[in-house]
Structures are given as structure tokens and as C-alpha cells.
Regions:
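Alpha/beta-hydrolase fold catalytic core
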Residues: 1-18, 39-41, 77, 81-82
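Short hydrophobic segments within beta-strands
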Residues: 19-23, 87
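Serine-hydrolase catalytic-loop signature spanning alpha/beta hydrolases and amidase-signature enzymes
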Residues: 22-32, 43
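Gly/Ser/Thr-rich beta-alpha loop segments that engage phosphate groups in nucleotides
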Residues: 24-27, 52-54, 90
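A short acidic, amphipathic alpha-helical/loop segment
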Residues: 32-33, 98
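Active-site loop/oxyanion-hole signature of alpha/beta-hydrolase fold enzymes
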Residues: 35, 44-87
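Aromatic pocket-lining residues of Rossmann-like dinucleotide-binding sites
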Residues: 37, 99-100
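Gly/Ala-rich beta-loop-alpha elbow adjacent to hydrolase catalytic centers
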Residues: 88-92, 96
Length: 101
């Protein structure tokens, strides 16, 4: 399972906003955005496999867009996030597009 952080807004009715970083980055790149968006959304920040606190050797599969996309979906399912807005940069935006497909 990927490492991730959740910041839940006190208002349970607000939407989720999920942040996906690019290759070579990790969830800490979003620190400035967290300050603003946590006022209006529940936030989910994910470290992709092999990045940040998500250790790559914990995953048996080859690193493909499909496998990494499935990693993200597993986190969404674990947190019971049925709908989310997404913010991504570089590789993160490619993965978001794969999720949308």
C-alpha cells in the first residue's frame, strides 16, 4: 500500500481533493497548497511507489502506468473516497488521466 496523508475538513460535506506528484517528487511538494485548500476540501496526498515514504521494494509488479494507477485507486478505496477532484504535476497528471479513463 502506498504511503499517503489525509487532511479532513471539519465540514463532512465538502468534496475531496487528491494531489498526485510527479516523477522524482513526493507529497511534500504540495505543502503550500495544503494551507489554502484544507479550508475548503478534504485533502488526500499520495506518495507514488518508489517515492517519498512509499518503498518501491514492497511492490512485486513492474512499474507501469496501469499498476501505479491501481495503487492510487486502492488508496481511494481504502479511504472510501468515491469522488474526488484531482491535482497533478508531470507524471501525476498522466496518472490522473489514466484514472479518468
Amino acid at each position: 500500500m502506498l504511503h499517503y496523508l489525509c487532511f479532513k475538513n471539519p465540514n463532512k460535506d465538502v468534496s475531496w481533493l487528491t494531489f498526485i506528484h510527479g516523477a522524482g517528487g513526493n507529497s511534500s511538494i504540495w505543502s503550500q497548497q495544503i494551507r489554502f485548500f484544507k479550508q475548503f476540501y478534504h485533502l488526500l496526498l499520495i506518495d507514488l511507489r518508489g517515492h517519498g515514504k512509499s518503498i518501491s521494494h514492497e511492490f512485486d509488479e513492474v512499474y507501469t502506468f496501469e499498476n501505479v494507477t491501481e495503487d492510487i485507486i486502492q488508496v481511494l478505496d481504502k479511504e472510501v473516497i468515491k469522488k474526488s477532484h484531482f491535482v497533478g504535476i508531470s507524471l501525476g497528471s498522466i496518472l490522473i488521466r489514466k484514472i479518468a479513463d
